[in-house]
A protein has these predicted regions:
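NTP-dependent small-molecule kinase module
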Residues: 1-5, 25, 29, 100, ...
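Hydrophobic anchor at the beta1->P-loop junction of P-loop NTPases
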Residues: 11
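P-loop (Walker A) phosphate-binding loop of NTP-binding proteins
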Residues: 14
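Hydrophobic positions on the alpha1 helix immediately C-terminal to the Walker A/P-loop
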Residues: 22
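Short glycine-rich anion-binding loops that position phosphate/pyrophosphate groups of nucleotides
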Residues: 83-86, 107-109, 155
Length: 170
């Protein structure tokens, strides 16, 4: 894969994997803009993801996420997606057409330690699903859409950033 100048870098992965944190660091390191789709959703909804999930349900949150992503028109940006972006083929094809999709792979026990409450975090999943259930359901989707997979489970932010930079065809 050859990375064209001005292409976006799209980060996908489970909630708690570090998409937003690493996205900011990556954008700064390569001189790109940073876009966090979770923040765009919150701005459009006028409430937190957790509140939106509570008031409208997980399917409405997934739909809004897909609409926000399909409305993106950016270049030279690092885009941190919500963990459920991969449920929308249309949204993911829109993202893939604009750049390189990087799956930030993280072990369940690491994610579990970072996420206090799935509901408060705004994780778009049916009631009763555990984080393990959500991860098992999403891994095949992340792997399907990823151009690159970077394992970051036992790395701090700087190490994870170095791993991403090493694997990106910049």
């Amino acid at each position: 894969m050859v990375f064209a100048q001005h292409e976006n870098i799209i980060l996908i992965g489970m909630p708690g994997a570090g998409k937003s944190t690493l996205g900011v660091l990556l954008a700064k390191a390569i001189g790109y803009d940073f876009i966090d789709t979770d923040l765009l959703i919150q701005r459009q909804a006028g409430m937190t993801l957790g509140d939106y999930l509570h008031n409208h349900g997980y399917q409405a949150l997934r739909q809004m996420e897909a609409e926000v992503i399909q409305g993106l028109n950016s270049a030279s940006s690092v885009i941190a997606t919500g963990g459920s972006a991969v449920y929308s083929d249309e949204a993911m094809h829109h993202l893939k057409a604009s750049g390189c999709v990087v799956y930030l792979q993280c072990l369940l026990n690491v994610l579990d330690g970072r996420i206090a409450s799935m509901n408060d975090r705004g994780i778009a999943a049916p009631s009763g699903q555990t984080l393990a259930d959500v991860q098992a359901e999403r891994i095949p989707l992340y792997e399907h859409f990823a151009d690159l997979t970077v394992e970051i489970s036992h790395q701090d932010s700087e190490q994870a950033l170095a791993s991403i930079l090493q694997q990106l065809p910049l």
